[in-house]
Amino acid sequence: MTESFAQLFEESLKNIKTRPGSIIQGTVVAITKDTILVDAKLKSESKIPIDQFKNSQGELEVKVGDQIDVALDAIEDGFGETLLSREKAKRHEAWLTLEQAYKDSKTVVGLINGKVKGGFTVELEDIRAFLPGSLVDIRPVRETMHLEGKELEFKVIKLDQKRNNVVVSRRAVIESEYNAERNLLLETLQEGLIVSGIVKNLTDYGAFVDLGGVDGLLHITDMAWKRVKHPSEIVNIGDEVKIKILKFDREKIRVSLGLKQLSDDPWTKISERYPEKTKITGRVTNLTDYGCFVEIEEGVEGLVHVSEMDWTNKNIHPSKMVQVNSVVKVMILDIDEERRRISLGLKQCKNNPWMEFSKKYNKGSHVVGKIKSITDFGIFIGLEGSIDGLVHLSDISWNISGEESVKKYKKGEEVLAVVLQVDPDRERISLGIKQLQEDPFAKYVSSHKKGSLVSGTIKKIDNNVIVVSLSEHIDGLIKFLNISDEIMNVHDNKPWNKAKIGEIVEVKLNSIDKKERIIYLSILEKQELKISNDIKKNNSHKQEIDKDKNFSNAMTEAFKAAKNVD
């Protein structure tokens, strides 16, 4: 009976493939902690490690009574036991699936689980495949972090089971999907349409958004109404965004997208909301060498030029006045809605030191300050409020030239001056030092009128004029034509020879040039004046004599008439 059973069993083995590697079917008859007992109707039941029946999450995939495929390793291992493998059977199934997919050009599902030279490794159930870097996507992809760990579809483009070589492509799947989606999308896309998409890539100038078969560019300037330094401030890879189609070139299949266009333009009617000279608070968003940008509301920024930051420090660097994210008070100076530019002022929200000075000091007021600098055109004096006043060269001395008088002063020296003029709008203060004293020229001409006779001392003799000192620091000029014969020798090569330096002369004050501060004198006209005065005097005397004579004659005639009557 036993031999008969053995013979029958041997005969049954002949009817099945019993060489190692064959795939046969078995039944799960028992499950223990470490093994699973499988009956494949061979000489004995086989114990297979339980790990071969678990999935990638560590979950057991079979139960007692399940029919499963296993690979035959050996009918008898020398100890009377049959060796089976569930793992090899699964690999065999996977290869069959890959072969069918390769034959039918269908996709398979796998996971990108590592990076190797030239590409990535992909786990296709129990088979490891190679994914070239150029076939990850339609566009080059440097990082696959956002793809790793996700179930993705691939196409098998090369298969060699003997060499255990499988090459897959994700790009082929995307292209196939894109072609179908693109054709459908291209029929519906139009400018002004609001669509949804997935951010797939970021650059310095914007973000590429997958609209479902067609990529569109969301430029950085169309992300928000406010200033955006980098696209990552607004969107990130993988974000689903709602955007507006701004431009669509159907021939070149180029799509320009806009995000900010979904909200109202904050620049609309901005001049009505912020009239000039309005004072508001804002946040500093950026610093440059020429100023700082201040956000006065969401999406609206204005520039505070460096010249509008401080009343006195015109070239101060913005970083010494404000910092990024600082909240500051500014004034609206100008709005150009067309060019979307706003000029703001920081200093205008502080007291104007020039205006404060003009309120405190009037023309003629005395001020004290230290000399800050001396230039070719005058002296700058530091005044309260950290402002400067200028003493022009012409306002240093009444009698000495500015070039000479300025040499008497040194930087840092404290001086007294008179306020001549204050112009807050032009930020200028004119000061004078000579005005601390009375003008000797004005004093002299006020007491010596034109045409009067004055005396002076000859100070200098030139070929054309004689300089006469009339008073301390007051000189007069006698021109050649106004020199009398008394001091002139026409036969000499010199125009005169009798005039001597130090000689006191009496002259006529001929004319006064107040602008040039020159007094013109004349000796000739002085003599003419004397002659005229003498003639007038003689004429007056003669008239008196004639008057007396006429009176005497009248009396004589009267006596004669009286005598004849008698």
Swiss-Prot record:
Source domain of life: Bacteria
Domain S1 motif intervals? 21-87, 105-171, 192-260, 277-347, 364-434, 451-524
Q: Name one GO cellular component term.
A: cytosolic small ribosomal subunit
The cross-references to Pfam families, in alphabetical order and at most eight, read: S1
Q: Which UniProt keywords apply?
A: Repeat, Ribonucleoprotein, Ribosomal protein, RNA-binding
The Swiss-Prot or TrEMBL record annotates one GO molecular function as:
mRNA binding
InterPro entries the UniProt entry points to: NA-bd_OB-fold, Ribos_protein_bS1-like, Ribosomal_bS1, Ribosomal_protein_S1-like, S1_domain
Question: Could you tell me which Gene3D superfamilies the record lists for this protein?
Answer: Nucleic acid-binding proteins (2.40.50.140)
GO biological process entries: translation
Return the NCBIfam families for the record: PRK06299.1-1, PRK06299.1-2, PRK06299.1-4, rpsA
Give the family per the record. Answer: Belongs to the bacterial ribosomal protein bS1 family.
Q: What role does this protein play?
A: Binds mRNA; thus facilitating recognition of the initiation point. It is needed to translate mRNA with a short Shine-Dalgarno (SD) purine-rich sequence.
Q: What is this protein called?
A: Small ribosomal subunit protein bS1
Organism of origin is: Buchnera aphidicola subsp. Baizongia pistaciae (strain Bp)
